[in-house]
A protein has these predicted regions:
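A short beta-strand element within beta-rich, extracytoplasmic domains
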Residues: 32-46, 101-103
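Disordered, acidic Ser/Thr/Pro-rich linker "stalks" and the adjacent N-terminal cap
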Residues: 1-29, 45, 120-166
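Short, surface-exposed beta-strand/strand-loop-strand elements in extracellular ectodomains
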Residues: 45-60
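Predominantly extracellular/luminal cell-surface or secreted proteins
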Residues: 40, 55-59, 117
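Short, structured interface segments
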Residues: 111-122
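Intrinsic, low-complexity N-terminal interaction/targeting segments
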Residues: 2-15, 63-91, 161-166
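Beta-sandwich interaction modules
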Residues: 28-31, 71-110
C-alpha cells in the first residue's frame, strides 16, 4: 500500500463524483495507421471502467499540453463497454496516419495496459542518410515465411542488436 491506498501495476483514477470522464494521451512510438487497440483491465475486477473510447490525432513534433487540447481528435473506437480483468480488444477501421491517441475511460477506473497495434508509417522528412528500409520502426513488415517453429521472423527486423540465442 502507498500513501494513496493500494498500489496497482496500471493506471487507476480516483472515483469521479462529478460529471465527465478521465483520459490519458499517448504519443505513439512511431506514427502509423492504427488497426486495433487493446484496453487490458487485468487484475482490475471491481474498479475497471465500464466504458471506454479511443480518439486519434496527427500532430508533428512534440506538442505541449495546450497544443494537445487544441488538436482535432477523430474517434477511432466509439464509446463502448469494457469488462474487468480482461484484455478488451477493439478493431479500428481507419487508413489515416496518426501520431497520438487518447484513451477515455467512463467515468473512471483502472487500466493495466493500453496497446495500440498497426502499421508504422514514418515521415520521410525526418529520415536522413542511409535508412534501413526493412526495419520494423521504419514501416518494414514480414509478410510470410516458410517456418516459425523456433521463433517469429519478425525478430529479423526488430530494432537493436540481438541479445541472445534464447
Amino acid at each position: 500500500f502507498g500513501n494513496k491506498g493500494k498500489v496497482y501495476d496500471g493506471w487507476e483514477t480516483r472515483r469521479r463524483r462529478s460529471p465527465g470522464h478521465d483520459h490519458a494521451i499517448v504519443r505513439l512510438g512511431a506514427p502509423g495507421v492504427v488497426r486495433g487497440v487493446v484496453v487490458d483491465t487485468a487484475f482490475f475486477r471491481g474498479n475497471y471502467p465500464p466504458q471506454v473510447s479511443v480518439e486519434a490525432t496527427s500532430i508533428e513534433g512534440y506538442p505541449s499540453p495546450d497544443d494537445m487540447a487544441d488538436a482535432v481528435w477523430q474517434t477511432i473506437v466509439a464509446e463502448t463497454p469494457a469488462e474487468g480483468d480482461t484484455a478488451n480488444r477493439y478493431a479500428v477501421a481507419s487508413d489515416r496516419r496518426w501520431t497520438h491517441v487518447r484513451l477515455s475511460i467512463y467515468p473512471d477506473g483502472g487500466v493495466a495496459r493500453f496497446r495500440v497495434h498497426g502499421d508504422v508509417v514514418p515521415d520521410p522528412r525526418h529520415l536522413e542518410g542511409t535508412v534501413d528500409v526493412a526495419a520494423l520502426e521504419n514501416g518494414g513488415a514480414v509478410v510470410d515465411c516458410s517456418d516459425r517453429f523456433y521463433s517469429s521472423p519478425v525478430n529479423l527486423i526488430l530494432p537493436g542488436r540481438a541479445r541472445s540465442m534464447g
